[in-house]
A protein has these predicted regions:
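Extreme N-terminal tail/first-helix region
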Residues: 1-19
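Charged, gly/pro-rich active-site loop segments
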Residues: 1-3, 76-131
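Hydrophobic alpha-helical segments typical of transmembrane helices
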Residues: 6-7, 54, 95
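A generic structural signal for nonpolar/aromatic side chains embedded in well-ordered alpha-helices
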Residues: 10-12, 57-58, 99, 122
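Short beta-strand segments
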Residues: 16-50, 58, 64-68, 79
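A short beta-turn/loop motif at secondary-structure boundaries
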Residues: 27-29, 70-74, 112-114
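Short, surface-exposed beta-strand-loop junctions and turns on beta-sheet-rich folds
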Residues: 52-54, 73
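A short, polar/proline- and glycine-enriched secondary-structure boundary/capping micro-motif
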Residues: 55-61, 77, 105
Length: 131
C-alpha cells in the first residue's frame, strides 16, 4: 500500500517522530505504547524485547494500529492500520542499534544487553491523515 505523500515526511529519520502502537490484549481491550520505528521498503519496522506485553499481543493478535504525530504540530498526524506479517529475532539487535542512532544519536542501544530483541514487520492496510 502506498504511503500518503502529504505525511511521508513523518517517517523520515531526521523527524524522529514516535509511533503510538495499539495492540489488543487477550481480553479484547486495547494496549497503547509509544515506540520507535523506521521503514524498510513498504513495511514499518518496530522493535521490542521478547516477552513484553506488546510482543505477546502482536504474536497472538497481529492486527495493529499506529498513530504517528508530527513533533512540531500535534494537530498533524497519520494513522496506520495494518498487520504484523513477520516477527524475527534475526538482526533485531542491529535494528535496535539503528533506532538508537536515529532517536538518541548513540551507536549502541543503551538498554539491557541480555534482552532478546525482536523486530516486527508491519504491512500497512489503511491510512488516515489529519493536518
Amino acid at each position: 500500500m502506498k504511503f500518503p505523500e502529504t505525511h511521508r515526511d513523518l517517517f523520515a529519520d531526521e523527524v524522529k517522530a514516535f509511533a503510538f502502537l495499539s495492540t489488543t490484549m487477550a481480553s479484547g481491550t486495547p494496549q497503547v505504547t509509544p515506540i520507535w520505528f523506521d521503514l524498510e521498503k513498504d513495511y514499518i519496522l518496530l522493535n521490542s524485547a521478547r516477552g513484553r506485553v506488546k510482543d505477546r499481543n502482536m504474536r497472538a493478535r497481529p492486527n495493529v494500529a499506529l498513530a504517528i504525530v508530527d513533533p512540531n504540530n500535534p494537530y498533524r498526524y497519520i494513522q496506520v492500520r495494518g498487520k504484523v506479517i513477520k516477527i524475527t529475532e534475526e538482526g533485531a539487535r542491529a535494528h535496535i542499534d539503528r533506532l538508537a542512532k536515529k532517536y538518541l544519536g548513540k551507536k549502541i542501544f543503551p538498554g539491557d544487553p541480555s534482552e532478546v530483541r525482536v523486530t516486527y514487520f508491519v504491512q500497512p492496510e489503511a491510512f488516515s491523515t489529519m493536518g
